């Protein structure tokens, strides 16, 4: 690359801005055609994708990447299937662009409503997880946004292989290549440039480690949609159904350890602890989960449960480690979650309707659940299509960010020669 990183990123930004204007007026059928063609291209390129991904995995192992990071990096056949299905599902979703709602007449006689429009250009910065390339590209494309994707250097070969499939889909639909651009340099200066171009980029969505997201939040000159941690809780209430409690608490922790919606702390009402914790502990031990608990938990489950420290309650492990606390009741559970949680996803297991309603109302998180695993906190599971990320902010989007989260609204006004007096 002969041009400087800043010049290169500025060129990507200019091209994305121009493409965003074309995308904003693209027909739904044209956008869907690009998505379906990209899905077909992925399906046909499975061998190429696997080969590129193996290059990244081999380099990651050689560089000592942690198991959780390698898990996120891997493009298994099932994950390739999920990417293809994600593209096809997004193609079936209703197109929000151009939708006009809340039309009403006001006393002056004019008619006012709101029209849904694209944000413009979305910058995505992410580590590992090459599937994010597809998730982000599909949602941005369907919502009429151009996107600039800056993946981690550890996934460079995987991302480039995926990008070729996306470009094929764009070409077949007659859409500009700059609608989806993957940053091809691994120079870290590209991140600084991308988050400092408000003239070209309308919003940044970072997905990665806490350090990366904190840096972007601190330095960005562009609005950021983000979450820092996934410290998710399951609270087993005294009125819980034992079978449901065991099934959900098992799945929330052990279905996968790396995702941000995995349970990291289990809270159990003291009145049900003796019945539910021993069978749960057996399941966790059989699956190799390290248990850490407060004094009451250790007294109940035995000395092999490590002492939980104050830091444990604030930690997103992304690993087979679980903190357990026995609490006096719902008030203590809510207080613990609102003190130590990350406002991501928290669940209560209970058959008591009033307890469930209190939990939903008082836990300050983006997703709050009753009798369901925290692992459901996902755009695909919510019917949004593939998500672009999860936001724990309260502006502009909150929770899994799908198509609607990538749009804004503008007022539209109809008159008949009306003038203000």
UniProtKB/Swiss-Prot annotation:
PROSITE patterns: PROA
Family designation: Belongs to the gamma-glutamyl phosphate reductase family.
Protein name per its UniProtKB record: Gamma-glutamyl phosphate reductase
Pfam families linked to this entry: Aldedh (PF00171)
UniProt lineage: Bacteria, Pseudomonadati, Pseudomonadota, Gammaproteobacteria, Pseudomonadales
GO CC annotations on file: cytoplasm
Lineage top rank: taxon: Bacteria
Compartments, record wording: Cytoplasm
